[in-house]
């Protein structure tokens, strides 16, 4: 359909920009510093793609392409997180899964839209949750 073509085009553009924005090597000297960098990059990218992801969400249930697009993005985000974390955290399944959830687009979008937090407030909330989880 025309809508599917439109969303496919939009989705590919978002994915390209998203991956470019997150694929630069992380420069932090410790895994904690690299994790902070990763969080910063995600937040910057999430803020950019939010209007598109919200529009896409309304149509996703009717589009296999958009469903697979979401899965691809989540897999990519998860793999980036795995590369940053030490084995002790990767092996702790519940901590890793909670961290993956906290740093997802869905968490960011809920903080921004449903809980009406500013970008700075949402960032602080996520950083505090991550710090508490990793303490």
List each language-model region with its residue ranges:
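Short, solvent-exposed positions on alpha-helices
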Residues: 9, 97, 120-121
